[in-house]
Structures are given as structure tokens and as C-alpha cells.
Amino acid sequence: MAKRGVKLTLIGRRLRGAFNRRLVASRGVHTLPDRGSSGAAVAALRRGEVLAIAVDQNMRPSRGVFVDFFGTPACTTPAAAVYALRAGAPLIAAFPTRSKNRTHVVKVCGPFETSERGHRAVIDLTQKVTRAVEQAVRDHPDHWFWVHRRWKTRPPE
């Protein structure tokens, strides 16, 4: 995307290794740490940049909301929904898939909208994005793997 002139900001843990960090930066991708970046993330959206967040990771209850994922409650980051709502930006999901000729095709879903307000809007949008992830996994299970326990955090009884 950055190669095509789209400003892309990626939120996540700091990449290991100077080579990896230089590689990402050389592609025009700006990175933000996964903690303490909410102001910068919202500002990036308000500037019209694309903000990328991995939403298929297990979260601690203090940092996530429970939504349905493959029929099981999954504690999921609400960050994409929160930032989109704060910035007044559209919320979309994008899934790259590798084609037979070794290029990548990106499927874009959304924009996701809600008639809810406040915390209910965050949960509603997070559920909609999670459903899109679920469909992407169903469409291309060979493109997906988790190296962590996705459903580790359980909802309170």
C-alpha cells in the first residue's frame, strides 16, 4: 500500500532486529508501539492515513472486549473501533492473500458502521471486524496460523 502512495501506519510490538525495522521503514511504513499510541493513532487517521492493527490476538480482560469468534467468546482488542470512532474515520478490514503467481491480492471488507453509541458501538464494530476475520480464515485457512492461544482469556462467569 505504501508503495502505491498510501500512507500506512502499523501498530504493534517493536520488530525484532534492525534489519526488520529498516525493511519496514524502507517500504514507507510508519510504526507505532502497541501501548501509549492512541493519540498518534487517531492523529494518523485524521490525516487520512491507513492504520493497521492485528485484531486476531488474545487480550487481557482489562484491554479487550469479548466478541464471538468461531462460536466462542474471544477477548479482542477494541482499538480499531475506538480509533475509528474517535477520528470519525471509516473502519475497514483488509486481508492479503497470496496468488498462484506469487503476487498478493488484498481483499477489503467494509466500511463497517454502527447505529450504537459509546461502549456498545465499540463492541458492535469489534464484532463486525471479527466476523470479517472469521470469514477470511474460512476462505483461506492455509494463509492463517496462530502461535498463541487465541481463546486463552475467558469471560467472567
PLM feature spans:
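Membrane-interfacial amphipathic helices and adjacent loop/beta segments
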Residues: 7-35
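Non-catalytic C-terminal accessory region of glycerolipid acyltransferases
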Residues: 2-4, 35-157
